[in-house]
Amino acid sequence: MATPRLFKLKSQVAPALSGPVATDLPYARVYVDTGVFHLDSPYDYEVPEKLTHVVLTGVRVQVPFGNREVEGLVIERVVAPQVTNGLKTITKVLSIHPVATAKSLELIAQCAQRWATNPWDVIRSAIPPRVAAVDKTFQPSSSRVAKSNSQSDICFRAFEPHLSAHEQVTSIALESIRKGSVLIVAPDERDIVAICAQLERSAQPYLRIDSALSRNDRYANFLEATQEKNQIVIGSRSAIFAPLAPGATVIVFKESSPDLYEVRSPAWNARDVAMMRKSIDSARVILCGYVPSLDVAALIDSKRIAYFNSNAKISVKAFTPVDASLLPGRIFTDIRSNISQGPVLFVLPRKGYANGILCAHCKNVALCSCGGRLHLTSKNADPACRICGALSKQWKCSFCTRDKKFVVSRGIERAQEEIARAFPNTPIVLSFGDVIKDRVEAKPCIVLATPGAIPQVVGGYSAVVVLEGLSYFSHDDLRANERANELFFEVAGS
């Protein structure tokens, strides 16, 4: 027989007394992480007298909400609350360092209204997670910004196609830092690293804010950015919300890049947020890239955005492929002459080995049982479905039952085989997918890369070959044309 347990009374937990309410501005308006989408309004809380000196605008606090304790962000201190009955008291201050200014909180509110979302969804992207160890050691600076850019305009600067985009955006930043602080928003880590390297060559200090850093470094740099000093801040798309000094310059690098769109709800994009900062922060906004996006092009046509470009000519040769061959016969002489001078870049649209398979006998498309097309990730790999990922180890044509495959829509690995046969004894470097090369040596070789994975080389490439050029325009979306034009001009500056 089981031994009965002793009966224990459940103790009642009473809330601790918070003490008297502050005499000066006794209430705080707070954004609360409710976890409920439609509860998106700020809430008023009483401020205890013992916390009155640390409950400031932009400070993280812990507040009671329902039957639990949640995080909140102080918007402002007020004299009278919106609702007088049933007010609760701020439990404690999580961090004494403000992580938002009145202007950045206004920006968060406008973004939440524009994209119809809970403000905390924007705060989650705008402010890095708190690190207690950094909070304890961070020392706020007593000096504030001394310069302010008097211009508050917005423009698009088209890069020159024969020059590196990273060098050109660095030049714009160094020109703007003389007039006030600068924020550079770049699409991805590779662009951030390249721009940081250019700033270091110019002996220009900067603050970096992106997810590639450790949590400690990212949070420490973010706190330093809130000090509103004359400095260059660079980061990925979330850095667009970093607090800025009045009259700062915001530079959106490659503004047409899809990486500048937030993948989580509410799917804001850095370009539109930067344009909102023009009116909120009196910021000067510079959108830059080789080709404006369709959105910016419409604003340029309507004269709402100024457009600046410079005339430049680059040597371009077009070759028509014959019989679906990868390399036209007339291109070999140009490639051989340029290989002797340095690395030659080949840009291909697809990774893998073959993006499509046909039956070699009846030429019907090889399909998975789910209806998806089969492809080859490497030469000796089994056909895999592009939709469900299932492998077809014993594939046979569903029409003629034969098993001989004919590969179409070549990927970078199959292109490597053909180029290696065309240029024997020439070193070939691959950069795509999970094997991206950041740099290659400036010596005779062939570099095969997919868009977005092009390695840098000191002095640039001796020649750039864009293979299957028309395929870049054949994507089934309206932005295919703008992406293709941006890519062609970008590789020209490589």
Name the predicted role of every residue range.
Residues I184-V185, V233-I234, I286-C288, V347, ...:
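Short, hydrophobic beta-strand segments that form beta-sheet elements in well-ordered domains
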Residues V193-Q198, V407-D434:
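Short, charged N-terminal beta->alpha structural module
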